[in-house]
Amino acid sequence: MRSHYNTDLGISHVGQSVKLCGWVNSYRDHGGVIFIDLRDRSGIIQLVCDPNDSKEAHEIASNARNEFVLITEGTIRPRGEGLVNPKLKTGEIEVVVSKLTIENESAVPPFAIADESVNEELRLKYRFLDLRNPKLYENFALRSKACIAARNSLANMGFLEVETPILTKATPEGARDYLVPSRVHQGEFYALPQSPQLFKQLLMCSGFDRYFQIAKCFRDEDLRADRQPEFTQIDVEMSFCEQKDVIKVAETFLKDIFKACGKEIQTPFRQMQYKDAMENYGSDKPDLRFDLKFIDVIDIFTKSNNEIFANIAKDTKKNRIKAIRVPKGDTIFSKRQMQRFEEFVRKFGAQGLAFIQVKKDGLKGPLCKFFSEEDLNELSKRCELEVGDVVFFGAGAKKTVLDYMGRFRIFLANELKLIDPNALEFLWVVDFPMFEQNDDGSYSAMHHPFTMPKNIDETDLEEISSIAYDVVLNGVELGGGSIRIHKNDIQQKVFKLLNIDEEQQKEKFGFLLDALSFGAPPHGGIAIGLDRLIMLVTGANSIREVIAFPKTQRAQCLMTDAPSPASNEAMRELGIKLRENIK
């Protein structure tokens, strides 16, 4: 029906006859000559409907309105002098229309396509209109290229694409499951998979050796800008491997994905232990596009005359005192900014934000009076302070200090405009703890309970580490993986440490324990969040910009009005009756 997409055309096509299809983006009547901006998925081109060229086409054009569907034929000509539009890919040319057809009319649209001021909820309600925006289309074109590149890259490395079940058994993986009632087995439920984790391990037990899948996953959790109830991941598993083998495979297909998206990245990525990431950056996914690394000064504060700081410094296992040096910060930050910094960290549990300024005549600030001159010199040397600098201090319980100082580090970087938006800083964070303590004192697996521990016989659960690894890009966790437990006795021991008794093990994981009893090979893998990856590549503000039909932050689809009530008949067939107070 068409000869070209709009942006396929340029100055080299002048004089050529074309046939184009698309929507009216806008129209203007200039003294009898009608100009129409025709939009297709690639972008916009200008149509010129002049009665001197075609009276019939001009008459039809006079009836066109925004979002009408047009089919047009005409000839490419260069725009007149001074009329070139550098904002358009086709800004040097226009189409002189000889034939025009209104293929379909449109109701008055609730907003102009590509109007960035439109409320997001309105855009999501009319998502089919929102997706007509060529900028959004470019996101999905890039997503398609990324998926094709991932498939080709993994296939070239000997991986087999295998689909795993969507209707499966509920297993504890950290978030709530979406449950699906069974009509045939009333009172029983399937769960939608939070990941293909157990099935891909079973495929390794089956001898498939190398598996991948671009998998849809489901988690019923609180939503944020980078979370959705259903999301997609590039899921990979391989047998007879070590951590370094999985990392090499992941770097290979990530490099191929970025190349397909027009970006070159360097491999291998740098690596950092989890402990170092937390102690130096206050995050297990540090953004390395800028410095502002923590400086450990707790030993110096043991000599302080300030009772609060001195008491904190006595317990180096439970407490931390960290410093962040900002070069020339004393010459940059106003008194009001310093107040804002303290207000910011207080939101995350800080009792305050101490600081020292470096003046020409020495160190200044309320803290200075609590140190001897020798200790101040040691502090200055440790922090490599220079005239004009300011150094901030966070002190208190380890978890709280690392958290708010990590957040403050990012806040400072944004204030100082230190972040290069075009930089791509990849990082592997390795050697994660096997377990983490919950607020109630119990322990849970930091990644998942199928991760291979390094020192399972250690009596202190917090000292057990795991063969787990996360890949981070610009401070965002792209994905994570681990070497898995492939021996039945070790898996049962991990379950026991998590207070999962033998009866629960058999009920929830009996099939996995059976598989591990029949000669399971060493295996490991990784999963990369496709939505987050494309969000970072495109520079989108939210993964909702790279998912065709996303949910809101309340897990609703405003376009289809899902979720919605089921009919009484459907509920009867499923054997389900709602409580009376459920609306």
UniProtKB/Swiss-Prot annotation:
The keyword RNA-binding is assigned to this record: no
Superkingdom in the source lineage: Bacteria
BP GO terms, sorted: aspartyl-tRNA aminoacylation
EC number(s) stated in the UniProt entry for this protein: 6.1.1.23
Family assignment from sequence similarity: Belongs to the class-II aminoacyl-tRNA synthetase family. Type 1 subfamily.
Function: Aspartyl-tRNA synthetase with relaxed tRNA specificity since it is able to aspartylate not only its cognate tRNA(Asp) but also tRNA(Asn). Reaction proceeds in two steps: L-aspartate is first activated by ATP to form Asp-AMP and then transferred to the acceptor end of tRNA(Asp/Asn).
Protein localization: Cytoplasm
Annotated source species: Campylobacter jejuni subsp. jejuni serotype O:2 (strain ATCC 700819 / NCTC 11168)
Keywords: Aminoacyl-tRNA synthetase, ATP-binding, Cytoplasm, Ligase, Nucleotide-binding, Protein biosynthesis
Organism lineage: Bacteria, Pseudomonadati, Campylobacterota, Epsilonproteobacteria, Campylobacterales
Main location: cytoplasm
Protein name (record): Aspartate--tRNA(Asp/Asn) ligase
